[in-house]
């Protein structure tokens, strides 16, 4: 099975797998059952921004979700990622819909990782920015239903030709290059990720959510990981 660390924007509460009974953001360490959650005042039809950061000195993974003109939601969890993730990983975005549906549109995505070692050469860093997405992206690995559209957006889950969200869809997008996320000699390993998103839904209960995730480089969509499992996990354990 894949080794996954994720920040979830969970639009549909699945209380049977430990979700709080409201939309929330959460931090997932190797399981869909979040280690830490915070209530998320999701606003359909508005562009939101997510900022995620990790610092190996503080050993804290944190995420902030905000919409222009309204208060932000923050969640954090103390974890030593050296003990969880392999040394090399890929970073990605995932989303699902189920019986209920929503658009899971990504408008922009950036990521920076840094490995500070005691040596003079501090070359172990990776940075990418997508302010828009090309139609045939060479620098993204698209999995499942994920596509890029003519407006320069990344649609993680299926939409109709008129832009309406489709149910029972799962899609992921990974940056093509593996990331050296930690090494034994590193003094500090840190990363920052930011993405902007737009969720629209005709349903009273949009579903299911979007994640930013980090996984082993050969990660793929697990069988049966749709809906509440957000395209990341094969089961709810």
UniProtKB/Swiss-Prot annotation:
It comes from the Eukaryota. A carbohydrate binds at residues 12, 99-100, 228. GO terms for cellular component: aleurone grain; plant-type vacuole. The keyword NAD does not apply. Seed. InterPro entries: ConA-like_dom_sf, Lectin_LegA_CS, Lectin_legB_Mn/Ca_BS, Legume_lectin_dom, Leguminous_Lectin. Gene3D superfamilies: 2.60.120.200. D-mannose/D-glucose-binding lectin. Induces histamine release in mast cells from hamster and rat. Induces lymphocyte proliferation and IFNG production. This is Lectin alpha chain.
């Amino acid at each position: 099975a894949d080794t996954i660390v994720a920040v979830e924007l969970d639009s549909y509460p699945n209380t049977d797998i430990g979700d709080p009974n409201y939309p929330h953001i959460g931090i997932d360490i190797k399981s869909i059952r979040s280690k830490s959650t915070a209530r998320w005042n999701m606003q359909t039809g508005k562009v939101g921004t997510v900022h995620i950061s990790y610092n190996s000195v503080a050993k804290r993974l944190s995420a902030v979700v905000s919409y222009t003109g309204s208060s932000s939601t923050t969640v954090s969890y103390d974890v030593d990622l050296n003990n969880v993730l392999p040394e090399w990983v890929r970073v990605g975005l995932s989303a699902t819909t189920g019986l209920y549906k929503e658009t899971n549109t990504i408008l922009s995505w950036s990521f920076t990782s840094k490995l500070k070692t005691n040596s003079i050469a501090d070359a172990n860093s990776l940075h990418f920015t997508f302010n828009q997405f090309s139609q045939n992206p060479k620098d993204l690995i698209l999995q499942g239903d994920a596509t890029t559209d003519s407006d320069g957006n990344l649609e993680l889950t299926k939409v109709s030709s008129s832009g309406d969200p489709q149910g029972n869809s799962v899609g992921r997008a990974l940056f093509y290059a593996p990331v050296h996320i930690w090494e034994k000699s590193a003094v500090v390993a840190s990363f920052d990720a930011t993405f902007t998103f737009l969720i629209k839904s005709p349903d009273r209960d949009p579903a299911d959510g979007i994640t930013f995730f980090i996984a082993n480089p050969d990660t793929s969509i697990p069988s049966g990981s749709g809906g509440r499992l957000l395209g990341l996990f094969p089961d709810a354990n």
